[in-house]
Amino acid sequence: MLERTLRVLEYNKVKEQLLEHTASSLGRDKVKHLVPSTDFEEIVEMQDTTDEAAKVIRLKGSAPLGGITDIRSNVKRAKIGSMLSPNELLDIANTMYGSRNMKRFIEDMVDNGVDLPILETHVAQIVSLYDLEKKITNCIGDGGEVVDSASDKLRGIRTQIRTAESRIREKLENMTRSSNAQKMLSDSIVTIRNERYVIPVKQEYRGVYGGIVHDQSASGQTLFIEPQVIVELNNALQEARVKEKQEIERILLMLTEEVAVEADIVLSNVEVVANLDFIFAKAFYAKRIKATKPIVNNERYMDLRQARHPLIDPEVIVPNNIMLGKDFTTIVITGPNTGGKTVTLKTVGICVLMAQSGLHIPVMDESEICVFKNIFADIGDEQSIEQSLSTFSSHMVNIVDILEKADFESLVLFDELGAGTDPQEGAALAISILDEVCNRGARVVATTHYPELKAYGYNREQVINASVEFDVNTLSPTYKLLIGVPGRSNAFEISKRLGLSDRVIEQARNHISTDTNKIENMIAKLEESQKNAERDWNEAEALRKQSEKLHRELQRQIIEFNEERDERLLKAQKEGEEKVEAAKKEAEGIIQELRQLRKAQLANVKDHELIEAKSRLEGAAPELVKKQKVNVKNTAPKQQLRAGDEVKVLTFGQKGQLLEKVSDTEWSVQIGILKMKVKESDMEYINTPKQTEKKAVATVKGRDYHVSLELDLRGERFENAMARVEKYLDDAQLASYPRVSIIHGKGTGALRQGVQDYLKKHRGVKTFRYGDMGEGGLGVTVVELK
């Protein structure tokens, strides 16, 4: 991108706001070097990455990036053998902890079912150096001091130091507390000079204590003397301190060498956390400006819904819908100055730059944006005093440069095209420049106050007029963009509101040609029609949203009803099974009792009477249980019966064996000790499988009442999407849905084409079509099922 384009579109101001959300100098360095990408795949991945970080912030509120610092120079020094200071080593340990903590944070979210594939890939590159981290923190305290426990030798030396200091203080305090000493000392204190303990002695008593004078007061009346009696003790203390320093240096060198061994891993981890800091800064900034992830396409069109400029307070700015690249490739915004035209122009430019930098943009969901190889902008008054260029000349220098470089992959933004010269010539130049850029296939947004360009949009197929709405009642622009309506000056209406007489205004109208008046009246009617159409659309949109809400509520109630019904059926079935089981047990008991009675010759009971008794008892079983007991394999075509086959006599519910066929429809059947004739229609063939064979058992899948009426495939890879479509259509048919919607987005069109090719071949599909305006348009396919 041209540096001038980034400057006039205030890209660096966006980066300054982004910097406020970084957690470390590592992230800040990434932001400072941020420039828009022109690679489609890279931009899509950056947008997806920012979206994952935004999801983390929505779920967790923040990310644990604290304690991370830029330790790269320290690690590189360790590699070449320089000894690191305690604080430098502590920074390394803290950064290692921060990277390890960040890795655990993301992995825990993934383990809990949050889908973060890109962030998961990032943290997978972090290698835990827990042992090195603990070695450093075990040796260095939070304040940057080497602790006693760093080594046994250091602990012993410091014990000696404390003992020596205690003995020295004790001796000196005894000296200062004596009654004789009071008159010889300037103050009864023990202090330190040149790292040796001393006492403040008056000048005239310097010879009383002997020893060494280390300092004197500003007046010269007080000498700081190390008495002779503690010279040896101070010497011993100094020797211990030298040993302490040597041991500390040994420990620091040892830790530095440990860092040098793992230097490459540490530097790799630093790069990962730098990227994570940068990524989460983007997500926090998106939250700040209420931005969303745009759909990125490679088809050179954009659809910005309710777009806002990120540098203007969202509570103040008026959002606008801006479309470019489908029905028209050029927008010409006409109308008076100070009407918000330049803000609209800059909004388009900065949204494109942000999106191509992986930043979410301040628009509504489902907004689309395309990738431009070049963005050219001629905005503002940039006169060059050194080159003595006028406003017009300055603009023309930029325009000449743009015309040399613009092509079909370019976005060109012109502010007040042709301004600064004779209006008639300026308008003619503006038209020629627009024709030249449009013929190259570039996407163009231009602003102008020349009325001649109002007709330009009507005479060119790929060009559309637009204006910024002006409220005559308040005498101020509303900053609302009106696509398809050219701007008008409103001079007469403003003058009338300010008190100019009707007579003067009418005379002024007479000075304007009839054609001009007709055009102004036509524009006024267009504005009114636009307002009415927008009002109607808003009402329709509100009704659509209300309908969707009612639909979702109805679907929820249907699901709840079906769940409750299924629950009651299961409960009833269970109760029925329990009753049947009880009846069977009772029947078996009765039959057993009757058989025992017959054996005892206490009753003259026949087997067929026993069978009939049991059949009557089983007849009391609930119908649902009988249905449940029918095996799927029995619904197959009727088996060819042969003598010796085992069958079930349905009337009695008993198993029997076929003896011989006595007629076309009857068989002689052996049931226990009883032989009887049974019709084929009253028997069921029992297939007894061989032990060595395994038969496939058919299963019947019930309806799933939790199938959604929509399938969202956006972001899916082609193969995964097709597999999901296949399963979804099967589930929808089982759920008896008459119609479903498949959301594939507009994108490159590959996924949309793949879905519709599949639907053409699916036997369960009756018809399909694109969604209507309220259903998602070309981004949705509505499927009618058989």
From Swiss-Prot:
According to the UniProt record, what class of enzyme is this? hydrolase
Q: Name one GO biological process term.
A: mismatch repair
The GO terms this record gives for MF are: ATP binding; ATP hydrolysis activity; ATP-dependent DNA damage sensor activity; endonuclease activity; mismatched DNA binding; ribosomal large subunit binding; rRNA binding
Coiled-coil stretches are none
* Lineage top rank: taxon: Bacteria
Q: Which InterPro entries match?
A: DNA_mismatch_repair_MutS_C, DNA_mismatch_repair_MutS_core, DNA_mismatch_repair_MutS_sf, MSSS, MutS, MutS2, P-loop_NTPase, Smr_dom
| HAMAP family hit by this protein | MutS2
**Family membership noted in the UniProt record:** Belongs to the DNA mismatch repair MutS family. MutS2 subfamily.
Q: What is this protein called?
A: Endonuclease MutS2
> Its gene?
mutS2
